[in-house]
Amino acid sequence: MYATITSGVRKALGLVVLLAVLQDSTAQQTAPKKDTVAVTKLQVTGTIRDAATGKGIVGARVSLPNVSASITDASGSFKVTVPTYFEDLMVTAEGYDTKQIPLKGRKTIEVSLLEEGYNGFQDPLTSPLATAPSRNTTTASSRIQLDGAWTRPMETLDGLLQGQIAGLNSTRRSGTPGVGANLFLRGYNSLYGTNKPLVIVDGMIYDVNDYGQSIIANNYTNPFALINVQDIDNVTVLKDAASIYGAKGANGAIIITTSRAKQQATHIDFGAYTTYNQQPSNLPVMNAADYRIYLAGMLQSKGMTSTQINAMPFMIDDTTGNPEYYRYHNNTNWQDKIMKSSLTNNYFLRVTGGDNIATYALSVGYAKAQGIIRATDMNRYNTRFNAAFNFSKRFTGAANLSFTYNEQNLRDQGISDKTAPVFLALTKAPFLLDREVNDKGITSPNYAETDFLNKSNPAVLINNMQAFNKYYRFFGSFKFNYAISKSFNASTLFGITYDKVRENIFIPRKGVQDDTLSNAVADSRLGTQVKRLFSYYSDTKLEYNKTVNRYHQFTSRLGLRYQHSDAEQDYALGFNSATDDLVSVQNGLNALRQIGGGIGEWNWMNIYFNAEYAFKNKLFFAVNAAADGSSRFGKEVKNGVQINGNHFAVLPSASFAWLLSSENFMADSKIDLFKLRLSWSMTGNDDIGNYTTRQTYTSQNLLGMQGLVRNGIPTPALQWETGEKFNAGVDVSALNDRLTFTADLFHTKTRNMLVYENITGGAGFNTIVTN
C-alpha cells in the first residue's frame, strides 16, 4: 500500500538534500573568504545574582551568541561587548536555568537566576520537532519539570498531572495502586472515537490504548503504570496546533522526556521510601437496628403482612425458639472487613556518567504498593537505559531503552452487585456475620454463605476470590543524526513496542451469588485472558536552519513517520468447576465454556512539513502541514488527497507570537515577560476501527456445521474525524519569573464525527457506522 508512496517521498527528500547542499556550496564559493562587518563595539555591564539569596554568581556565562561572551567575577559582575544596545543576551550558570535577556537599549542590567528545574517561561520546552525556550513558542503549551519526582515516588504520571496543567483534566479511576487516571485535554472531541491525548516518550509514540476489556470487572490495565515517574525529566503538554501529528493529534499531545546524563562525571542517585496509606473513613451506612426497620418496610412493600415480617428470624429478639438468633443479631462493620491501612515501599537507583564519546543514564527500580482494599497490591520492576553517542563531529546518536514488569492482585470494582466487595460492603445487611455461627453463638472459621436476600459475602470475595494481572512492556528506540552541512541536518529514529497482558480470575461458589447464563446457572466462575501488542515506528526528517544578519532566523523541516501495529486478544471463560479448589478454566464444564477474542493490524503514514521564522527573538511565525494515510480509511473517501489509490488527510496549521516584553517601549517595565499568541489548526482522529470500512466475516456453528456470516455492513466512505481549532492566548511573568500567568481563549469544532446511524432491519443489522 505504501511502497510506492515511500519511494516517492525518498526521491523528494533526496532532491531537497541535494538542493540544500548545492545552496551551501554555492554560498561558500561566492562569499568572501573572511567576513568583514563594520561593527561598533559597545559595552554592557551588569551583575548576575542568585534569585533566592541575592548573592552574586561566580562563573556565570553572559554571551551574545556567535559574537561575544564574558564570565562573571567573584561578585557576579561582568562586561560584554555588543554591536548595539538592542540585542538579546544569553545567561547560563551551572545549577541554574538559562535566561535570555533583551537589552532594549539598556547599558547596565541586573539578572537574577532561578535554580535549575524551576517551571517558568525561560525553561526549554520540548515541541514535536525540537527543543526551544518556552518564551519563543507560538502555541498553547505547558511544561512541568519533574526531575525525578522524588517527593511522589509511587504516583503514575497520569495521576501526578492532576491539577498541574490548565485545561488538562485528570480523573482518577479508583484508589487501586497503579490504576491511574483518565486524561482529557480541553474536554471531549468525539462521541465514539478516542478522547485520549497522544503520548510521545523520547520522540516515539507511546501506545496508551486498551485492546480488549478486562475480565476483572471494571478494572483497567494502565500503560502509564509502566513508566516510573522517577525516570521522567519533564513533560510538555501541547494543547493546540498539533496538526504535525496529523490524524492522531485531535486531542492534543503529551510529550515526555526521560532523564539522561547532564554531565560526564559519574553520579549515583539512590532513593528508598516507605509510605503509610491510611484506611479512609467509613461511609455512613445504617446500623443493624436501622437496617431492620428499612428491611421490614421493603418487605411490606412487597406484600408481606406485619405478622409474616415479625416472624422472620432477624426480627425475633428472643433466643428461645430461634436457633438462628446469633446469625441475625450482630452489628458488623463490613467496610472494616474489606479495607485496611497499608504500606508502600519504593526503591530506585540511577547511575549517570560518560566521556566525550558517550554519556549514559542507567536506572533500576522496585516498588510494592499495598492497596487499602485487603488482598490487593502491585509489584513493579523497571529498568531504563538512555545513552547519547558522538561518533564524529557530524554524526551523533542516541538510545532510549526501557523494560517494565508489573504484577497486580485485584478485585472486582464498581457497581457489580454480585462480585465487587466495596459495593457489597455498602449494601450488605449489618446484622449478619462474615463467618458461620451455630445456635450457641460459636463462630466457625468457615465463611458464611449468601444471605436470605441472596447477597454475596464481601469477606469471601476478599479472601477466596483470585484476580491477577501480569503486564510487561519493552519500549525502545535508536536515533541517529547527521550534519550534512552547517545548516542542513538529517535524522532518523526507529523503535519498537512490545507488551503483553495476562489476566486470571476465579470466583468461588460458596458465599457468592450465582450468575445467570443463557443456558445455565453459574456458581463458580473461572477465566483467563492474554492481550498482546507489537508495534514498530520510524521518524525520518530533514532540517534546514539559517540565520541572516543575526536577526532573521529561518527553520524548515520535512519528514516522514510510519507506524505498523499488530494487536491480539484471546480469552476463555469457564463455569461450575467441581470444587472451589479447582480454579483454572479447563476445570469448568465443557458445555458452558466460552472462548473469544480479536485481532487488529493497521498502518499509519504521516508526511509532515514545518516552517518557522523568528525576527529579533520577538516575532515568531510557524506553519505546519501533514498528509496522513491510514489502512483504516475507506477506499471511497471524498475529502483529502489521493496518492496511488490511497487517501490522505491534509491537515494544516499556522501560529504567531509577539513577545511584547522585548520591545523597546517596555524597557523600564517591571514585567519580565509579556507575550501574545494566535493559532489555528486542523487535526484528525483516526480512531474509526481497523476494519470498519471493509466487509468482514465471523465463524458460526449451526447444528455442528461451521460456517461464515457477515460481521457488519462496510462503509467504504468512512474517514477520519476532523477538528478545527482556534486559540488566542497571553503569557505573563513578573517578580523575576516567580509569578506566571497564562490565559487562553479557544474554540474547537469537530466535523465528520463518527456516529452509529440506525438502518432498517432488512439489512440484518440495526446500525451502520458513518461520519
Predicted regions and their residues:
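Short, acidic, small-residue-rich periplasmic hinge/interaction motif at the N-terminus
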Residues: 29-41, 47-53, 61, 92-96, ...
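Short acidic/polar hinge/loop motifs at secondary-structure boundaries
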Residues: 79-81, 204-239
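Short, acidic Ser/Thr/Gly-rich low-complexity loop/linker segments typical of extracellular
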Residues: 68-77
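Short, polar/charged loop or turn motifs at beta-strand boundaries
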Residues: 48-51, 137-163, 171-175, 183-190, ...
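Extracytoplasmic beta-strand/coil segments of soluble accessory domains associated
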Residues: 159-208, 234, 243-262
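Surface-exposed loop/interface segments of Gram-negative outer-membrane beta-barrel transport/assembly proteins
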Residues: 119, 195, 263-330, 371-376, ...
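N-terminal periplasmic accessory domains that precede
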Residues: 107-114, 130-135, 157-160, 183-186, ...
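A beta-strand signature from Gram-negative outer-membrane beta-barrel systems
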Residues: 109-112, 164-166, 229-269, 344-346, ...
